[in-house]
Amino acid sequence: KRGRRIVDDDFLVVFNAGTYRPLRAWELSAQAVRETLETNLVGTMSATAAVLPTLLAQGEGAIALVGSVAGYGGLPKATVYGPSKAALINFAEVLHLDLSPRGIGVFLIDPGFVATPLTAQNDFAMPALQTPEQAAAAIVDGFARGDFEIHFPKRFTRALKLLQLLPRPLYFALIRRATGLYGVPP
């Protein structure tokens, strides 16, 4: 769905705070939940609340939230990260519904794997790994097109979206097979 395009003189706020710990379910802790949700969700929502009065008073501008394809569906090692990004995706959709009629653009950036210090923690294959430069180019292109959701690389992100249409048992089987991660602790 197309939204507001970003042009040179637009006011754009990008919320890109995030933290990630690769955790399996048996490694879950209340501390990991608090820290991840505080950064990935509460921090972003609070910062959005702080900037919204200015944008609404201006009647223009845009907000971009950085989610993740990990928010599309349950994935091994994304025990807290995935749900935090799923909530952020939902938040961006709500913002778009409420703010776009008032002249405020809302963008959701859902990258696949991008080579960063956070993804360097992963001990598994990361399909379609992007450089930060490739990610930046995809984001700028998405802003220019006025895409609500800017997701990349397309082949990878579209495959993950299609998996969500499958019955859950088939989804689980395919994810386990693709990742090689099964529910047995080491």
Where do the language-model regions lie?
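Conserved NAD(P)H cofactor-binding loop of Rossmann-fold oxidoreductase domains
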Residues: N16-R21
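Substrate-binding pocket helix/loop in short-chain dehydrogenase/reductase
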Residues: R24-A25, A32-L37
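Active-site loop immediately N-terminal to the catalytic Tyr-X3-Lys motif
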Residues: W26, L75-T79
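Active-site helix of classical SDR
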Residues: T48, S84
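Alpha-helical segment proximal to the catalytic Tyr-Lys
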Residues: P53, L97-P101
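Residue(s) in the substrate-gating loop at a strand-loop-helix junction
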Residues: S68
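C-terminal helical subdomain
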Residues: L108, F124-A159
